[in-house]
């Protein structure tokens, strides 16, 4: 990869979710559209409305989904689904705000496509505040920063997820049964610490991210989608059977655990980075708002149903990933392995976004004959960094909550409403709209602060240190 190409290559905001890079727009930000309406979008692209819907659904289904039963536990069996619904509505509304602002700048600046970072930068340039206009370039940098934190945070979550699930499968191997209808107590064979499992995956993930060809990555994306879909169907098949009496479950959980719910929930819903690339790939982008709302309704129903059913099925024993609660029979052990394989291959796709932001900075400063070495070295360092962070925080639930609170809340809740104000304030906005935007941003900021504090507080409490056991051992 030459230095010149790295310098000139336009960055595309692929997503902070499980969507492959090849589904991003192929046109650069500097391509000009013909004067006139926004209908110029999508003329040279090829995705149908159904393909866009599938990409949208795929991009919102990942590890965050499997952590929602524990999130419902942290909110309560009634408060949890209500809160998930509210967060889903607000998150989708913020996606709509981003699309509206992007349309505005495409028409105004005669561009064919603007990504999240550019939209924020142009929004600050339109602000009535001179200080914001003078520092508009920081808008793109802030978005890039949170994208990097979010994506590398996802990669940290993947390390913990892989370690926990493989550790459980290996330790229960001798006790695996043919009875897939009940959780039976088994004698686990102790193996190495979960952090050593993370180190075991490190060299394989390093080799995986050395693949820089997007076509090759799309093959891994397809394989990941198939394995995760099969696993998800089997998880639903189990949790809908023989649901225990829910009368002992709290309707509303203690307020102290609610911030952990917020972090996990917003981690799951933070797919705002993918909406603009998906829209730009459509043949008829006028249908995108309908596709967006339809897709997110399906996603919200999926989130609420899995969160509630998982909590109802396993109660207080629910773990950071519902896969850790599945029985120790051959079928559900296979489910854990299948989903883990999907997550393993998805690591490279999540890694692609921060790599495209960070690596050009270093490669452009290296001698031409050292470019490939520098590229691979930076990739190795970044993967090692995610592994080290996962080792330092080997609790799946808290890693998810922390990433969601720190970065996902900024991208999904805090920035879009402020962007709407800076973009349209000079053109006239109703006081109600300004109040609505301010309220969403304030709630997002409160969730950011309180959720981050509570996750860090839980991490430093020795009494809350996790014991890595198969939750099926609780069913005696």
UniProtKB/Swiss-Prot annotation:
Name under which the protein is recorded: Proton-coupled amino acid transporter 1
Transmembrane segment boundaries: 52-72, 79-99, 142-162, 191-211, 216-236, 258-278, 290-310, 343-363, 373-393, 398-418, 440-460
Sugar attachment sites: 174, 183, 470
Keywords: Amino-acid transport, Cell membrane, Disulfide bond, Glycoprotein, Lysosome, Membrane, Symport, Transmembrane, Transmembrane helix, Transport
GO molecular function terms attached to this record: ABC-type taurine transporter transporter activity; alanine transmembrane transporter activity; amino acid transmembrane transporter activity; amino acid:proton symporter activity; glycine transmembrane transporter activity; L-alanine transmembrane transporter activity; L-proline transmembrane transporter activity; proline:proton symporter activity
Disulphide bonds in the chain: 180-329
Region described as Disordered: spans on this chain: 1-32
Alphabetical list of Pfam families matching this protein: Aa_trans (PF01490)
Cross-referenced InterPro entries: AA_transpt_TM (IPR013057)
Effect of residue 473 to A/S: No effect on amino acid:proton symporter activity. No effect on localization to the plasma membrane
GO process annotations (BP): alanine transport; amino acid import across plasma membrane; amino acid transport; glycine transport; L-alanine transport; monoatomic ion transport; proline transmembrane transport; proline transport
Stated family: Belongs to the amino acid/polyamine transporter 2 family.
Catalysis performed (reactions): glycine(in) + H(+)(in) = glycine(out) + H(+)(out); L-alanine(in) + H(+)(in) = L-alanine(out) + H(+)(out); D-alanine(in) + H(+)(in) = D-alanine(out) + H(+)(out); L-proline(out) + H(+)(out) = L-proline(in) + H(+)(in)
Stretches assigned to the Extracellular side: 73-78, 163-190, 237-257, 311-342, 394-397, 461-476
GO (cellular component) term, any one: lysosomal membrane
UniProt keyword annotation of rRNA processing present: no
Presence of the UniProt keyword Oxidoreductase in the record: no
Its membrane topology: Multi-pass membrane protein
pH dependence, entry free text: Optimum pH is 5.0-5.5.
Annotated organism of origin: Homo sapiens (Human)
Annotated function: Electrogenic proton/amino acid symporter with selectivity for small apolar L-amino acids, their D-enantiomers and selected amino acid derivatives such as 4-aminobutanoate/GABA. May be involved in the efflux from the lysosomal compartment of neutral amino acids resulting from proteolysis. May play a role in specifying sites for exocytosis in neurons.
Gene expressing this chain: SLC36A1
């Amino acid at each position: 990869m030459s230095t010149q190409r790295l310098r000139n290559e336009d960055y595309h905001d692929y997503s902070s979710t499980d969507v492959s890079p090849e589904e991003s727009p192929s046109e650069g930000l500097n391509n000009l559209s013909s004067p006139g309406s926004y209908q110029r979008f999508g003329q040279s692209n090829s995705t149908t409305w159904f393909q866009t819907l599938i990409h949208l659904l795929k991009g919102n289904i990942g590890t965050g989904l499997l952590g929602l039963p524990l999130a419902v536990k942290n909110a309560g069996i009634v408060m949890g689904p209500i809160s998930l619904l509210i967060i889903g509505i607000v998150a989708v509304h913020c996606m709509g705000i981003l699309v509206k602002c992007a349309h505005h700048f495409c028409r105004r600046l005669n561009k064919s496509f603007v990504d999240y970072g550019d939209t924020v930068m142009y929004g600050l340039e339109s602000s009535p505040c001179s200080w914001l206009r003078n520092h508009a370039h920081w808008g793109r940098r802030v978005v890039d920063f949170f994208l990097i934190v979010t994506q590398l945070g996802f990669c940290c979550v993947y390390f913990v997820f892989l370690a926990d699930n493989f550790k459980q499968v290996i330790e229960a191997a001798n006790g695996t049964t043919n009875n897939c209808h009940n959780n039976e107590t088994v004698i686990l064979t102790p193996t190495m610490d979960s952090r050593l499992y993370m180190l075991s995956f490190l060299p394989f993930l390093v080799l995986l991210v050395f693949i820089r060809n997007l076509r090759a990555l799309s093959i891994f994306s397809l394989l990941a989608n198939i394995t995760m879909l099969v696993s998800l169907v089997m998880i639903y098949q189990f949790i809908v059977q023989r649901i225990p009496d829910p009368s002992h479950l709290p309707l509303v959980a203690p307020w102290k655990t609610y911030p952990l719910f917020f972090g996990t929930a917003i981690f799951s819903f933070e797919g705002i980075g993918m909406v603009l690339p998906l829209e730009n790939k459509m043949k008829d982008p006028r249908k995108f708002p309908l596709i967006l709302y339809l897709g997110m309704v399906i996603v919200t129903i999926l989130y609420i149903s899995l969160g509630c059913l998982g909590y109802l099925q396993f109660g207080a024993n629910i773990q950071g990933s519902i896969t850790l609660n599945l029985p120790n029979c051959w079928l559900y052990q296979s489910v854990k392995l299948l989903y883990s394989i999907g997550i393993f291959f998805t690591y490279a796709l999540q890694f692609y976004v921060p790599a495209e932001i960070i690596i050009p900075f270093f490669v452009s400063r290296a001698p031409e004959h050292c470019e490939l070495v520098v590229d691979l070295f930076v990739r190795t360092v970044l993967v090692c960094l995610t592994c080290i962070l996962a080792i330092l925080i080997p609790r799946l639930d808290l890693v998810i909550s922390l990433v969601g609170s720190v970065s996902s809340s900024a991208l999904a809740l805090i920035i879009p409403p402020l962007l709407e104000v800076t973009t349209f304030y000079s053109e006239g906005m109703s006081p109600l709209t300004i109040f609505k935007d301010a309220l969403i941003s304030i709630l997002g900021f409160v969730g950011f602060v309180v959720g981050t504090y509570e996750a860090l507080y839980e991490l430093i409490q020795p009494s809350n240190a996790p014991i890595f056991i198969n939750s099926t051992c609780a069913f005696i």
